[in-house]
Amino acid sequence: MRLARLLRGGTSVRPLCAVPCASRSLASASASGSGPASELGVPGQVDFYARFSPSPLSMKQFLDFGSVNACEKTSFMFLRQELPVRLANIMKEISLLPDNLLRTPSVQLVQSWYIQSLQELLDFKDKSAEDAKTIYEFTDTVIRIRNRHNDVIPTMAQGVTEYKESFGVDPVTSQNVQYFLDRFYMSRISIRMLLNQHSLLFGGKGSPSHRKHIGSINPNCDVVEVIKDGYENARRLCDLYYVNSPELELEELNAKSPGQTIQVVYVPSHLYHMVFELFKNAMRATMEHHADKGVYPPIQVHVTLGEEDLTVKMSDRGGGVPLRKIDRLFNYMYSTAPRPRVETSRAVPLAGFGYGLPISRLYAQYFQGDLKLYSLEGYGTDAVIYIKALSTESVERLPVYNKAAWKHYKANHEADDWCVPSREPKDMTTFRSS
């Protein structure tokens, strides 16, 4: 309750100082006197930084920055400007959620994390990039913020579940929450990407097994290797639960460079998250659909690299789902799973929330790809992951708070402009002439 008022300007906190001048837009705003130097508290800071659009980076830019003369000072100057902008943009949208959702303890907790992280970042806006102690403290702050936000996804999911249990869901609220969560989680993925890159490059704790990685990015990500890893781990879970599991049939075609291993510049953990989730779904459907037969058809995976796209198609024979249910699989508000407890980051991520598919789709869309489902009811389902083959085209997809976004939350959703068929058969006898 207090946090909602805080973001809306109902309560003031300690004054925060001038804005960073790392970009022309922020610098000019500060120089013209329109910056937040004279404003008090979090609301003024959020309003100021939300006026600026986030700066999307391409995979190539991430790669070039980390591999060619990686400079901690440059990263410091960019992140102290960019992170507040990304945080503020999504914080403005959080404040537009229904009041009853904002009052849930879980959403309050998420808001407190974002406020604290924003304030910690703004402590560096006037500090010199030439001061070694400042650079060290900033990296330490970045790692602390990253760890603080570990449980953002399940905690926000818990808040939505709390709201749903207490107040139910109407179509308008469901549509707005779906719109918000897609943008909120995409923002979270992007913020974590920046935090991870800085902490892995300059935090001194890079994994020895990932020496060729540039932060969290593998310049030569072996797609088939990641797919096999996801399959084996999903298979272990399937064997534990069903005491059996379907085999994997994998085929790869490198149409771009025939005969060579399929490799792309990508974040292996993102690809792993997607294929692991799809394997779990495919295995469960296959085991349950063929339970009475005792013979389980294999899961087929085709990997193709073309000039523009890397495509991964996973096909199962798990019985499929009706067309009308496909959209529900990506709906955050639809999950019928029992509410799990959010305890620590060591818990199985998103277990029980039904968020696996929508979050996986966001990972695919983050660098301009996509994830789509095509189902043949009674037979099985094809899941297709699209990834940009060129690192120059793999550019972050970032939400921006603007008038169009504001209107989406505030617009009155009118009646459908298409006829809605009746659930009951029409009694045609009423139209008979006497």
UniProtKB/Swiss-Prot annotation:
Transit peptide: 1-26
InterPro entries: AK/P_DHK_N_sf, BCDHK/PDK_N, BCKD/PDK, HATPase_C_sf, His_kinase_dom
PTM comment text: Phosphorylated by constitutively activated ABL1, FGFR1, FLT3 and JAK2 (in vitro), and this may also occur in cancer cells that express constitutively activated ABL1, FGFR1, FLT3 and JAK2. Phosphorylation at Tyr-241 and Tyr-242 strongly increases kinase activity, while phosphorylation at Tyr-136 has a lesser effect. Phosphorylated under hypoxic conditions at Thr-336 by phosphoglycerate kinase PGK1 which has an activating effect.
Phosphotyrosine PTM positions: 136, 241-242
Keywords from the UniProt entry: ATP-binding, Kinase, Mitochondrion, Nucleotide-binding, Phosphoprotein, Transferase, Transit peptide
CDD domains (alphabetical): HATPase_PDK-like
Occurrences of domain Histidine kinase (ranges): 161-391
Pfam families (alphabetical): BCDHK_Adom3 (PF10436), HATPase_c (PF02518)
EC numbers on record: 2.7.11.2
Residues annotated with Phosphothreonine modification: 336
Localization per Swiss-Prot or TrEMBL: Mitochondrion matrix
Coarse class of the protein's main subcellular location: mitochondrion
N6-succinyllysine carried by residues: 403
Induction data: Up-regulated by glucose and palmitate. Up- regulated via the HIF1A signaling pathway in response to hypoxia.
Function: Kinase that plays a key role in regulation of glucose and fatty acid metabolism and homeostasis via phosphorylation of the pyruvate dehydrogenase subunits PDHA1 and PDHA2. This inhibits pyruvate dehydrogenase activity, and thereby regulates metabolite flux through the tricarboxylic acid cycle, down-regulates aerobic respiration and inhibits the formation of acetyl-coenzyme A from pyruvate. Plays an important role in cellular responses to hypoxia and is important for cell proliferation under hypoxia.
Protein name, entry field: [Pyruvate dehydrogenase (acetyl-transferring)] kinase isozyme 1, mitochondrial
Name of the encoding gene: Pdk1
